Amino acid sequence: MGNKIAVIPGTFDPITNGHLDIIERAAKIFDVLYVAVLNNSSKKPLFTVEERMEMIKQVTAHLPNVAVESASGLTVDYAAKRGATAIVRGLRAVSDFEYEMQIASMNRTLNAEIETFFVMTNTKYSFLSSSMVKEVAQYQGDISELVPEMVNRAIQVKFNK
């Protein structure tokens, strides 16, 4: 059997300690892990895709089996092109599960060869989202425990602090 390849998709605008926790845990399970940075047209991003990719590359530099790429279109198609057999998704709460289950079911319908793996977020990050980080930062709240240090600095620059 060849390498176990997985994809973790997301907008990561910005990457949080919760995202990083899921990436680090998945990197222990899979031989190759692609972090697919999505350009979600329904969201107005704080950071460009390129900026997000660079931040993720920096905070995952200690993980030699992690590759960071941009992706568009269906995640299941991207996963198939990369030879992945798994899509990894982090779950914060039961409310996440309902939405993620619908996506996983659709992905399975589109490509039965690719499984979705749900990873429960560490409880200390169960409340955390990129949107929340941006909102707190916008109002000068302390986000230093919520994001990696270099991401914190980048956010401070964006909000001109």
Curated annotation (Swiss-Prot):
State which Enzyme Commission number(s) the record gives.
2.7.7.3
Q: What CDD domains does its record include?
A: PPAT
Q: What keywords were assigned to this record? A: ATP-binding, Coenzyme A biosynthesis, Cytoplasm, Magnesium, Nucleotide-binding, Nucleotidyltransferase, Transferase
Query: Where does the record place a coiled coil?
Result: none
Q: Does the keyword ATP-binding apply?
A: yes
Positions contributing to ATP binding: 11-12, 19, 90-92, 100, 125-131
Q: Which regions span the lipid bilayer?
A: none
GO MF annotations for this entry?
ATP binding; pantetheine-phosphate adenylyltransferase activity
Q: Which residues does the UniProt site feature Transition state stabilizer point to?
A: 19
Q: Where in the cell is it found?
A: Cytoplasm
Sorted alphabetically, the Gene Ontology BP terms of this entry are:
coenzyme A biosynthetic process
**Annotated pathway:** Cofactor biosynthesis; coenzyme A biosynthesis; CoA from (R)-pantothenate: step 4/5
| Residues that bind substrate | 11, 43, 75, 89
Where does it primarily localize? Answer: cytoplasm
**GO cellular component, as recorded:** cytoplasm
What role is this protein assigned? Reversibly transfers an adenylyl group from ATP to 4'-phosphopantetheine, yielding dephospho-CoA (dPCoA) and pyrophosphate.
Q: Which PANTHER family match?
A: PHOSPHOPANTETHEINE ADENYLYLTRANSFERASE
- Spell out the protein name for this chain: Phosphopantetheine adenylyltransferase
